[in-house]
Every structure is written in structure tokens, then in C-alpha cells.
Amino acid sequence: MSTAIQPAGTAGGGGSDSNGLADVVDTILDKGLVLDAYVRVSVVGIEILTVDARVVVASVDTYLRYADAVNRLDIVNEDPKSDLGGLVGDVAESATSGVAKGKTTGVLEAAGEKLGDMLTSDEPEPRKATRVRSRRADR
């Protein structure tokens, strides 16, 4: 008795295997295959590391439908001032702007007072007295 082994591609009764890969690719492009990962590492509200990886094997239409459905068209859609770093930045910014505003206001007020004093002064400025020598005293 002899046994014959047929190659996998020529097995009988299975349908058309020549279109197998094309069917798989067509199905993947039609349905889409998306591997999406968003990782954020923070310590005490301060963001240290952000990894946003997206691997998509799909047609453009399929991907756009997916992205629209899960709101992933814009990768970063969060308020940057919602974390501790944003709040600390706001406090520091307001403190420095307050100090700068105070100094500027003080300088402007002092300059205004000085200018007002100069303009409203009724007294003539004192002149420096000069000596006039007579020729007779030198003789």
C-alpha cells in the first residue's frame, strides 16, 4: 500500500485558494485593524511621559470613520491648565505680572509727581551767584 501526500495549496474540495490572500487583505482594509495605545505617566500631577501610538491597517474611509467614532482625530484634546503644572504656571505668572505691574505703576506715579512738581513750581529756580571782581581791587 502506498500513501501520497498532497501539497497544501492543491488540497481538493476546499474552494478557490488563489484568492485567499486577496480576500484577507480586502476584509482587513474594509473592516480595519487598529491598534491604539495612549499612555501617560505623571507624578503628583506633573506629566513626565506621554506615549501615543496608533497602528492602523485600514482604508482611509475606514480609519476616518473609526477616528470620528472614538474622537481620536485630534490626539491631544485636553486643557493644558487642568493639571497641577498648569495651575502652578498660572500662579507663578500672575505673581510675576502682579510684581511687574506694581513696579511699573510705582515708577509712573513717581515720574508723574516729579513732572507735576516741576510744572507747578511758582518759585524761580535759585541762580548761582557769581562774583564780579573789580579791576581796582586787583591793582
From Swiss-Prot:
One of its GO terms (cellular component) is vesicle membrane. Residues 129-139 have a biased composition (Basic residues). Keywords: Gas vesicle. One of its GO terms (molecular function) is structural molecule activity. InterPro entries: Gas-vesicle_GvpA-like (IPR000638), Gas_vesicle_GvpA (IPR047870), GvpA (IPR050530), GvpA-like_CS (IPR018493). It is found in: Gas vesicle shell. Residues 113-139 are annotated as: Disordered. The gas vesicle shell is 2 nm thick and consists of a single layer of this protein. It forms helical ribs nearly perpendicular to the long axis of the vesicle. Gas vesicles are hollow, gas filled proteinaceous nanostructures found in some microorganisms. During planktonic growth they allow positioning of the organism at a favorable depth for light or nutrient acquisition. GvpA forms the protein shell. Belongs to the gas vesicle GvpA family. This is Gas vesicle protein A. It comes from Mycobacterium sp. (strain KMS).
